[in-house]
């Protein structure tokens, strides 16, 4: 069981959420390549989701780092740098610890 702001959650639920979050970040790659018209709105929605996660699990530094990487990627015009930021963000999800 994992402790959070309002009680506890099963570890399996946390692992599933980490996978969903990685998928939500990874999809930013094809969205950028395809010039998805709602890409900016998607970034905003993802940042709001991360902000909520941060509040629920004790404001961890790695979540702030993740948010910073994504904010940087949001404005990156060079695709190779954008891709690296997105892949770094996906990898960072595995490093987030839940108390």
Language-model segments: residues:
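Generic structural signal for short, flexible, solvent-exposed coil/loop and linker residues
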Residues: 3, 10, 52-55, 71
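Amphipathic alpha-helical interaction modules
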Residues: 20-68
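Amphipathic alpha-helical binding modules
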Residues: 65-99
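Short terminal alpha-helical segments
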Residues: 1-38, 86, 90-96
